[in-house]
Amino acid sequence: MDPCECTKSGTCNCGGSCTCTNCSCTSCKKSCCPCCPSGCTKCASGCVCKGKTCDTSCCQ
């Protein structure tokens, strides 16, 4: 299980159910969350997106 960190409003659960509501996370370890764009490359370490854009720091 690899939960998302939501420090702002909204709830993220990237466990088995994988549900995100009003996701405002700044770091999301699963690409199933809407705060990680669909075009974001999936890496072995998981997708880490800053904000709602996918840049060079998306996967690290």
Curated annotation (Swiss-Prot):
Signal peptide stretch: none
Give binding positions for a divalent metal cation 3.
C14, C18, C23, C28
Keyword tags:
Metal-binding, Metal-thiolate cluster
List residues binding a divalent metal cation 4. C32, C33, C43, C47
**Alphabetical list of Pfam families matching this protein:** Metallothio (PF00131)
Query: Where are the residues of the annotated region Beta?
Result: 1-28
Briefly, what is this protein's role?
Metallothioneins have a high content of cysteine residues that bind various heavy metals.
Name under which the protein is recorded: Metallothionein B
Q: Which organism is it from?
A: Chaenocephalus aceratus
The beginning of the lineage is: Eukaryota, Metazoa, Chordata, Craniata, Vertebrata
Gene name per UniProt = mtb
